[in-house]
């Protein structure tokens, strides 16, 4: 990757660990000043100190906290909206999250982190990006946003929402020079995937990818600068743009 981020300001949510921490380190290595945001203050501050960035406590599901974070920073060049959770029902393995046992609180938790967090984040950073006529908003979706996930249907719901949001917002933001994109990793080796789930995936021959591969995809999306693009990351296969259907703004060929 040859992209140079010198002098740019990048925000990473969920930056205390896993994919977020890896991308924060990658941005810093490429020259960016990185703002790490998370609920985990200890690990988040450690990552920020390691890369010479800054740390901010942030509940991505809280619109007021978004305003307090983004307001004083001026325009950002990159926002990586990465924070997310799975359903995680008590007394059930991660491979069995029955809908009938999901409480209202559990539902609001996952929707707040995975959907509200992306919408509130984009809403907070977009105006100043539009004002400057440039910027990148990269969202972490999942392969679960491109297909069916029978063991956690609500997680799949949230990631389908992220994919649709990134594609649709790209049609608007792209006319102002701002690129939105979604990254769809397969199962990544992070704390969101339990040891039990990793063992099950390995036994089934499903690849578990490294956070570094996801960081590669984020940089690929930024370099490509294609508004509304969706990028698939699966095993060792090349990182590719995923586009199963013609975009809404293109006319279908006549029959």
Annotate each language-model stretch with its function.
Residues 16-17:
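Conserved glycine-rich cofactor-binding loop
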Residues 30, 147, 168-178:
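Active-site-adjacent segment of SDR/Rossmann-fold oxidoreductases
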Residues 41-42, 57-68, 104:
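The beta1-alpha1 cofactor-binding region of Rossmann-like NAD(H)/NADP(H)-dependent oxidoreductases
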Residues 82-95:
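Conserved NAD(P)H cofactor-binding loop of Rossmann-fold oxidoreductase domains
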Residues 85, 98-119, 134, 138, ...:
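Catalytic Tyr-X3-Lys loop
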Residues 122-123, 167:
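A short, exposed helix-loop element centered on a Lys and neighboring polar residues
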Residues 142:
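Residue(s) in the substrate-gating loop at a strand-loop-helix junction
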Residues 182, 198-244:
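C-terminal helical subdomain
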């Amino acid at each position: 990757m040859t992209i140079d981020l010198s002098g740019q300001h990048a925000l990473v949510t969920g930056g205390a660990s896993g994919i977020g921490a890896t991308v924060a380190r990658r941005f810093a290595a490429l020259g960016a000043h990185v703002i790490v945001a998370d609920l985990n203050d200890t690990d988040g501050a450690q990552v920020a100190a390691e890369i010479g960035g800054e740390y901010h406590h942030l509940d991505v599901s809280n619109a007021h906290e978004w305003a307090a974070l983004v307001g004083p920073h001026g325009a950002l060049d990159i926002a990586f909206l990465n924070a997310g959770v799975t359903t995680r029902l008590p007394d059930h393995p991660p491979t069995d999250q029955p809908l009938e046992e999901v409480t209202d609180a559990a539902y609001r938790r996952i929707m707040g982190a995975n959907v509200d967090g992306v919408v509130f984040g984009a809403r907070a950073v977009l105006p100043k990006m539009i004002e400057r006529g440039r910027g990148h908003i990269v969202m972490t979706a999942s392969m679960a946003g491109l297909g069916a996930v029978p063991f956690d249907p609500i997680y799949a719901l949230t990631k389908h929402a992220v994919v649709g949001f990134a594609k649709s917002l790209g049609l608007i933001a792209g006319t102002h020079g701002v690129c939105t994109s979604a990254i769809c990793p397969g199962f990544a080796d992070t704390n969101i995937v339990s040891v039990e789930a990793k063992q099950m995936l390995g036994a089934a021959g499903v690849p578990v990818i490294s956070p570094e591969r996801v960081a590669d995809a984020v940089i690929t999306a930024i370099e490509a600068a294609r508004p509304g693009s969706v990028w698939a990351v699966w095993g060792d296969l090349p990182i590719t743009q995923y586009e199963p259907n013609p975009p809404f703004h293109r006319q279908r060929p006549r029959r």
